[in-house]
Amino acid sequence: MRTVSINVSNLCIPCYNRCRYCLLSWDGKTIGVDYPRSEAYARKFYNWLQENRPELNFAFYFGYSMEHPHLLESIDFLREIGSPGGEFLQFDGMKFRKDEEIRELLLNLKARGIKLIDLTFYGTEAYHDQFAARPGDFDYLLRILRIANEVNLDVNAGLALNHENAGQAGELLEQLQRYRLSRVFAFVPHGEGRGENLEPVRFRQSDYDGLPASVKGIFNRQKFRPEGQWVRERRFSTW
């Protein structure tokens, strides 16, 4: 095994969603240290790697959301150390804002060097809001998407597929295609963290078979395969 990168993550920022498959197992309580302390630690780690292991990639992340009280200043630090968050932000779970507040935030982010934001959709409106455990979240993401288009900030949109929402994927994609997207893709949520909650509704081969061609076209079949196919091809680690 070869080490190629080192990541430091601090779960110190609350998220306004409670999604059923949260990788970080967000349960309403932050577990990280205070942000200034974590930034100082990340800086020391980065400086050490630059002097001793410059061939290793390094990234610093904070979560559970990007609702950082000093987000713009933190972006400066992320860009300074070459962390992806200096140019790209996952925009799920942000607090509700009025349109003019969204516009101001996005313009400030652009001015700070952010080039791309990412939004995740869990189905059409009613199902999405239930899945994210926040009424109004679907409409809020569409407002963010619309205003991002207006200020010329690139947006990626991910469609999280499971057994319950597979039948909504075509309608959802049609709705999203009314906007300008840098990339739109469908994926199967992971099983880590609170993703264990999705096991009863895990996406199945029959769900894939029923998808419209438009959705199949944005689904990475090489990455997301039935378990039986992975076993037959022996594309898994030996423990």
Residue ranges and their predicted role:
Residues M1-I31, R232-T238:
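N-terminal pre-core extensions flanking Radical SAM catalytic domains
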Residues I6, W26-E39, N52-H68, I81-E100, ...:
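Core AdoMet radical
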Residues N10-P14, R37-K44, P69:
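SEC14/CRAL-TRIO lipid-binding/transfer domains and related phosphoinositide-recognition modules
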Residues S25, I31-V33, E39, Y122, ...:
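Radical SAM enzyme [4Fe-4S]-AdoMet core and its adjacent flexible, acidic
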Residues A42-Y46, L72-D76, I102-L107, L142-L145, ...:
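Generic structural signal for well-ordered alpha-helices
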Residues K98-D99, N108, R221:
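Polar helix-capping/helix-linker motif
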